[in-house]
Amino acid sequence: MSDATSMKHPSGLTSGDFTAAEEPFALFAEWFAEAVASEPNDPNAMALATVDADGLPDVRMVLMKDYDATGFVFYSHLASQKGQELAANPKAALLFHWKSLRRQVRVRGLVAPVTDAEADAYFATRPKQAQIGAWASKQSQPLESRFAFEQAIAKVAAKHLLGEVPRPPGWSGWRVTPSHIEFWHDRPFRLHDRIEFRRDDPAHPWSKTRLYP
C-alpha cells in the first residue's frame, strides 16, 4: 500500500493485529512487501551494527539483498571495516526503519559468510559499472583524491571492456542468522506495540514475548 495512514484502524493498529503472529519470517515478509510499496527509496536499507577489537560499536547503512528463514544477506568487501570486525567477532545487529509505515524491525544474531556460489550469483546481477567499482575500490582504506579513484575505475573498465566481469576475490557476502527479531509499530501517545521472537538454536521453535513500549 502506498499510504501508511490507509492501513490504520481508529484503534491505531494496522489492518490485522501483527502481535498475533507466531512466526517472524512470515511477518517480516508481509511488512517488507508493504515497505517496498510505500517507502520512497531503498526499502531494503538496514543499519548494520558490529563491534571493533576494543568493543567499540560501529554502525552503517547497508542493503539487504536476500532473506529467507535462514537469515538476512548483504554484500561488501571482506577487507572493509565491517568485514574485519565480523571476521573477529561474527555477531551483528540489524535495524530496518520504514518511516512511511511507522515501523521498525530489529534483528540480532550470528553472522557467517555466504557460499562462493551465492556470492558469484549475486555479483553477476549487478550493473557492470558497479562490478567495476567493486574491483577499483579498496573500501575503508585512505583515498588520496576522487581523481585517484576515477583513475582506478578507468583502469579496471579498460581491462574488462568486453565480456563479463568476475567477482573480486575480496568481495563477498554475509548472512545474519537471527536469535532475536523484534517488531515495533508506532501508536498514538507513544503507546506502541512491540513483540520479540527468540530462539537459541535455528533448529528450535521460536518463543514470542510482548514487550512494554
Curated annotation (Swiss-Prot):
GO BP term, pick one: pyridoxine biosynthetic process
Enzyme class: oxidoreductase
Keywords linked to the UniProt accession: Flavoprotein, FMN, Oxidoreductase, Pyridoxine biosynthesis
GO molecular function ontology, one term from the record: FMN binding
UniProt-listed SUPFAM superfamilies: FMN-binding split barrel
Keyword hit for Flavoprotein: yes
Subunit structure: Homodimer.
The protein's role, per its UniProt record: Catalyzes the oxidation of either pyridoxine 5'-phosphate (PNP) or pyridoxamine 5'-phosphate (PMP) into pyridoxal 5'-phosphate (PLP).
UniProt-recorded name of the protein: Pyridoxine/pyridoxamine 5'-phosphate oxidase
Record organism: Rhodopseudomonas palustris (strain BisA53)
Gene expressing this chain: pdxH
